[in-house]
Amino acid sequence: MMRFTKSLLASVALCSLLSLPARAELDVAKLKTTIEASVENDYPKLDALYKDLHAHPEIAFQEVKTAAKLAAEMRAIGFEVTEQVGKTGLVAIYKNGDGPTIMVRTELDALPMEEKTGLPYASHDTTNWNGRETPVAHSCGHDIHMASWVGTAKTLVGLKDQWHGTLMFIAQPAEEEIAGAKAMLDDGLFTRFPKPDVGFALHDGASAYGTVSYRVGIGSSNQDGLFIRFHGRGGHGAMPQNTIDPVMIAARFVVDVQSVISREKDPTEFGVVSIGAIHGGTAGNIIPDNALVVGTIRTFKPEVRTKMLAGIERTAKAVAAMADAPPPDINLDAGAKAVVNDPAVVATAEKVLKAAFGDKIRTTPPNTTSEDYSEYVNAGVPSMFFNI
């Protein structure tokens, strides 16, 4: 119950504060007591919703049943709901007089992996993923986020005499593929619906139990995909002199590219290149015609990202040229940009968080993982992304 309670308290307190008239003062202690009582009353239903979502996960852009469940919950609370925004996303609007528009986001999607928790409500569902029947599991906590999102909406509506403005609750597909935020924006999220004055999102994590953590400025990393196909000339493994071995070229690249990190990037700045897969060949005695290297690139600052991308491309071309091979096919696929928390929003929200949670509030270094909530920030929504 603690994770639900903490996330609800944080979300509701933040939204309530920023929806109040400028002249009003927020009685945090009283609000906290009211919220805790509301959460206590609603918890059995929220827990049941969480377990149902956990047991029946859906992967990116397949979240049809998940979205339908959330749509039904939000309509029952009194929100006006629009479905199929950005394919499987939904937007829920609650108007409560004049005032700012506050956006709260949750994610819908799960991951293509097997659950091994042994929980009584563990997922046993599978789906077709990349042509294979694959297990699906909520291993990143989006089920917790969704249940908290619904609970936050219900609690805020119950507190509607204490705030005014418009609540814009969005349920986003395909966060795991860094694609859902852009899909919703491309489908008119901020033209078909009010553009938010302030936005919030949260993520559960493995920090100390019961803490709420955040930071001003950069909160997560830029993410770029690395897909490089090295070309060679295949042949028999016993006669390598008649071939150009793309596996050898790929292996040299995997090692040499790390010099971009150790010798070109400023060692005081964050940046990593991690290679997660190498695909090439069919048998041990056959040198293939090509080999594919797949990886990820993470950075915080734009100038570091630019330097690293240039170094990676230069290294790939160089190792191919060393082997007298054709130039490689290089695709450095731009993904999520860094989430940047707005200083003014954080400063305002921080007062409420500290009053509500005391020494459970922590400021943290930037997270080296990535998150496509940055799409909303870059579209002009001052935001705060925090962790529970």
Stretch-by-stretch model annotation:
Residues 2-23:
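Gram-negative bacterial Sec-dependent N-terminal signal peptides
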Residues 25-138, 147-164:
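Acidic/His- and Gly-rich active-site-bordering loop/insert found
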Residues 25-26, 30, 251-388:
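Metal-dependent amide/peptide-bond hydrolase catalytic core
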Residues 29, 40-44, 60-68, 143-147, ...:
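Soluble non-cytosolic domains of exported or imported proteins
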Residues 39-46, 50, 54-57, 61, ...:
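Sec/Tat-exported extracytoplasmic proteins
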Residues 53, 74, 92, 104, ...:
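Divalent metal-coordination and catalytic microenvironments
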Residues 126-137, 143-144, 155, 159-277, ...:
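Histidine/acidic-residue-rich, glycine-tolerant segments that coordinate divalent metal ions
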